[in-house]
Amino acid sequence: MSSVVVVGTQWGDEGKGKITDFLSQNAEVVARYQGGNNAGHTIKFDDVTYKLHLIPSGIFFEDKICVLGNGMVIDPKAFVEEVAYLHERNVSTDNLRISNRAHVILPYHLKLDILQEEDKGANKIGTTKKGIGPAYMDKAARVGIRVADLMDKDAFREKLVQNLKEKNRLFEKVYEADPIQVEEILDEYYAYGQKMAPYVTDTSVVLNDAIDEGKRVLFEGAQGVMLDIDQGTYPFVTSSNPIAGGVTIGSGVGPTKINHVVGVSKAYTTRVGDGPFPTELHDEIGNQIREVGREYGTTTGRARRVGWFDSVVVRHARRVSGITDLSLNSIDVLTGIETLKICVAYRYKGEIMKEFPASLKVLAECEPVYEEMPGWQEDITGAKSLDDLPENARHYLERVSQLTEIPLSIFSVGPDRSQTNVVRSVYRP
C-alpha cells in the first residue's frame, strides 16, 4: 500500500498540477478532495498544453481512476464543459468518478459571490467569483444541494424552491438585485446532472477498496496551505482545507491510510489576489520573474504577485500538513539573477520571529530577514539530476531544503513533464 498526498506549500499556483501529473504515471488512482473550479492547473506534455479546473491531472492516463471527492463543490455546467474540452482533444473520461456526496454550485452561488465581493469594496478578498465560498456556506448551513440530489429531479426541485426563497430575499432586500426563478435553473441543471450521472458513485468505497488492494493512490490538493481556511492567512483564504488533513474529510479515507505528504513549492513565491505577502517584490527583478515564469493565473488570467522564497511560510506548511517530501518547481526561472534572496525569518518591532503569525496586523508589520546567495547564469532546463546543476543552483536547493526542514524529493527545471526529476521516490513504503 502506498498513498501519497500532494499539497501546495504557498498560496497556490506552485505547480501542483504538473507534479500530480508526473506522479500519476506511477499511481493507479488520482483523487481531488476539496475546492472546485477555482483551482487551475496547467499540464504540458508532448508540446501540448492542457488547462484544467475541476478534473484531476491523472485523466490523461487511460488506466488511472480519477476521483472528484465528497469534499469538493462542483459546478455542473463547468464540469460538462470541461469534459467536452477533453473529448475535443481525444482524451477519454471513462475513468472518472464523482462522489454522490459532493456539493454542487448553482447560479445563485455565482451571483452571491459577485455581489458579496463587490459589497466589500476595499476589503475584498480577491475571490475567483466561481461560487465556491457561497456553496461551502450552504454546506455548513446544511442547506446545500449534493450530487445525489441532482440525480433526482423531484428532490432537486424541492431543495431548489426552498433555497431560492432565502436567496431571493437576500438578493432583493440586501443587494437590491433581481431574483432568480426556479425555472431558470431546474431543467438546465438537471440535464447537466444527467450528463454527470454515468460518473457518479460512492467514491469513499472506490478509494478505500483501492488502498486495501495495495494500489497506489494519489490525492491532489487544490490551492495551497496558506489559503487553508484554518491554517492560512485568514480571511484571505479559500473556503476549504487544502492541507493534508483535508484528505480524510474530503475523500472518506481515514488518516491511518496516508503514507507520505509531498509539499510542492516554487523556488520563489507567488500569490493571486489580496492579502499580506512579506517577501513581495515591486522592482525589476519581480517583473523579470513574473515574465520569465509566465506568472498569470490559469483561472483568472490575473498577473500574480511575485516575491522571494519564504522559508517561514513553507516551514509553517510543513508543520500543519505533516510534509515528508519537498518538490521544488520553476528553478529555471531564477537563472540569470545575480544575487538570490531567501527569507529565513521575520523582524517584528525589533524582535526576530521564526514562526508564521496568526494576526494579519502583525504580519503586515513584519519585515523579511534575508539570506543572500549567489545566482547562476547557465541554462539548466536540460538537467536530469542534481549533479547536472551548476554548483550555485545545487547550493540553493540544498539551502531551501535545510531551511524548510523538508528533504528534497523532486525538482523541476521547466514546464514539461520531461523536465521533472526525482531525487527519491515518494512511493517508498
From Swiss-Prot:
Localization of this protein: Cytoplasm
UniProt keyword terms in alphabetical order: Cytoplasm, GTP-binding, Ligase, Magnesium, Metal-binding, Nucleotide-binding, Purine biosynthesis
SMART domains documented for this protein: Adenylsucc_synt
Catalytic reaction equation(s): IMP + L-aspartate + GTP = N(6)-(1,2-dicarboxyethyl)-AMP + GDP + phosphate + 2 H(+)
Required co-factors: Mg(2+)
EC number of the protein: 6.3.4.4
Active site, UniProt feature: D13 (proton acceptor), H41 (proton donor)
Residues where substrate binds: T298, T299, T300, G301, R302, A303, R304
Annotated binding of GTP, by residue: 12-18, 40-42, 304, 330-332, 412-414
Chain residues that bind IMP: D13, E14, G15, K16, N38, A39, G40, H41, T128, R142, Q223, T238, R302
Chain positions recorded as Mg(2+) binding sites: D13, G40
Pathway(s) it belongs to: Purine metabolism; AMP biosynthesis via de novo pathway; AMP from IMP: step 1/2
SUBUNIT field: Homodimer.
Its biological purpose: Plays an important role in the de novo pathway of purine nucleotide biosynthesis. Catalyzes the first committed step in the biosynthesis of AMP from IMP.
Family: Belongs to the adenylosuccinate synthetase family.
Name this protein carries in UniProt: Adenylosuccinate synthetase
Organism whose genome encodes this protein: Oceanobacillus iheyensis (strain DSM 14371 / CIP 107618 / JCM 11309 / KCTC 3954 / HTE831)
Phylogenetic lineage: Bacteria, Bacillati, Bacillota, Bacilli, Bacillales
